[in-house]
Design a protein with these regions (language model features):
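Helix-loop boundary and gating motifs at the non-cytosolic
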Residues: 8-70, 225-267
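Glycine-rich segments within core transmembrane alpha-helices of 12-TM secondary carriers
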Residues: 147-168, 357-365
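Hydrophobic core of transmembrane alpha-helices in multi-pass small-molecule transporters
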Residues: 30, 98, 109-125, 315-329
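Conserved MFS/SLC helix-loop-helix module at the cytosolic interface between two early adjacent transmembrane helices
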Residues: 70-106
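Helix-to-loop junctions at the C-terminal end of transmembrane segments
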Residues: 71-83, 168, 276-289, 373-374
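Cytoplasmic helix-loop-helix junction between adjacent transmembrane helices
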Residues: 114-153
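Structural signature of the two symmetry-related core transmembrane helices
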Residues: 86-100, 291-306, 383-386
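C-terminal membrane-cytosol helix-exit motif in multi-pass small-molecule transporters
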Residues: 190-210, 395-400
């Protein structure tokens, strides 16, 4: 009995060796995560409730994805050459004006251009975030750092998703309209993201990072690794885009669930996803990165497929929550793994390339998924997504089972 007790460790103890500056970087970024969580519900559920079609919402998402794809590589190269810290902070400054526009209008003439700005900020984040955490940690501590990032990020995303659950109570107590509460919340969150950017600047203003005169993937091992990793990941991106960003719309169309309920559902999913990070580092340590990724993603795919057969809302929600937790348990492991198999000076560019080849097919398939839902075809997106997931998982194991992170 005593030996069992000595082996047990508090869950949070796995993060004790993560550098304090990395922890505060993660904590300060949670203000932006909170805002983006609400923003996602606003786009994918509230806009549909006020009469904007799933097809138009898909276009907004596609425009966001297009700007992300077009600028990710230039921004990634700039991050490697000019500093990942500066790119991350500058990217965060683009979020407040985007939120302010959404708080002021529902006119697509303005919302669609804001999709462009959203893509730019996302590209800046992708090119800098993983690379910056990897730069500030060692191989030993890195999985725990990425797990903490995933944990805090998803819980704060989830809190943003859950905000609409309080809106009926606020409306009843104040007499404010639904539109006023939704837009007012967006305005307040815009102010919070401004504060978040200021805190990040204060934290990192004296951080010294290594700049690289060149940022490109030479022909050879690095190029082959990034190409294989990214192409396989793009298959999952295409499958995910068919339905995952559109889950609130699917719940609305098939079961009549409004954003006051779909928001908390997404919140619960993100909390579970965040808590799954406790298992991520442990699985990677016990089984290795590749096996841990394959097992969690394959298990998730079973529940993805099962969603097509859900005949009532409670069952659909339960299946979705399990799928989300299992699929995203692999995310911090994949982030840490990619940063470990790529040289330090190419991390920003590698992150950008991987993000592009995931996001481009994801953006295209979101439009396809929105059109299918608009046409009343609610099952096919899940069948297609599950098939693409399974293909990618098998390919990933076949290609990377013998490739280990660099010391």
């Amino acid at each position: 009995m005593s030996s069992e007790k000595t082996q047990r460790k508090p869950l949070l103890k796995m993060f004790k060796d993560v550098p304090p500056k990395v922890k505060w970087l993660i904590y300060f970024s949670s203000l932006t995560n909170l805002a983006i969580g609400y923003f996602i519900v606003y786009i994918s559920a509230y806009l549909a409730e006020v009469g904007i079609s799933a097809r138009d919402i898909g276009v907004i998402m596609a425009v966001n994805g297009a700007s992300f794809v077009a600028l990710s590589i230039p921004i990634g190269m700039m991050a490697d050459k000019r500093g990942r810290r500066n790119i991350m902070i500058l990217g965060s400054l683009g979020i407040p004006p985007m939120l302010l526009v959404y708080s002021w209008t529902l006119d697509l003439t303005y919302l669609i251009p804001m999709g462009l700005l959203g893509g730019i900020t996302e590209a800046a984040f992708l090119a800098s975030w993983n690379a910056l955490i990897a730069d500030m940690t060692t191989v030993k501590v890195r999985p725990a750092a990425f797990s903490l990032s995933f944990l805090v990020g998803n819980i704060t995303f989830g809190t943003g998703f859950a905000l609409p659950a309080a809106f009926p109570m606020i409306q009843g107590a104040t007499g404010w309209s639904s539109a006023y509460v939704h837009s007012g919340t967006m305005f307040v969150l815009a102010l919070l993201t401004m504060a978040g950017s200021a805190l990040l600047w204060m934290l990192l203003k004296n951080y010294k990072e290594t700049l690289h005169e060149t940022s490109r993937l030479e022909r050879g091992e690095s190029l082959r690794i990034v190409a294989k990793f990214s192409i396989i990941n793009s298959t999952i991106g295409f499958g995910a885009g068919l339905i995952i960003p559109l889950i609130p719309i699917w719940l609305l169309y098939k079961f009549g669930i409004l954003d006051t309920y779909s928001g908390p559902i997404l919140a619960a999913a993100n909390v579970l996803m965040g808590l799954s990070a406790f298992g991520s580092a442990a699985l990677a340590k016990k089984y290795g990165d590749v096996k841990a990724i394959v097992v969690t993603q394959a298990s998730s795919t079973i529940f993805m497929f099962s969603l097509a057969f859900a005949m009532n809302a409670p069952l659909a929600v339960a299946l979705y929550l399990i799928r989300a937790a299992l699929m995203n348990m692999a995310s911090p492991i994949m982030d840490s793994y990619l940063m470990g198999i790529i040289s330090e000076r190419q991390r920003g560019l590698a992150s950008a390339i991987n993000g592009i080849v995931w996001r481009l097919p994801n953006s295209v398939s979101t439009v396809i998924g929105g059109a299918l839902l608009t046409a009343g075809i609610y099952d096919l997106p899940f069948f297609l997504a599950a098939g693409l997931y399974l293909t990618a998982i098998l390919l990933f194991y076949a290609v990377f089972k013998d490739i280990k992170p660099k010391k």
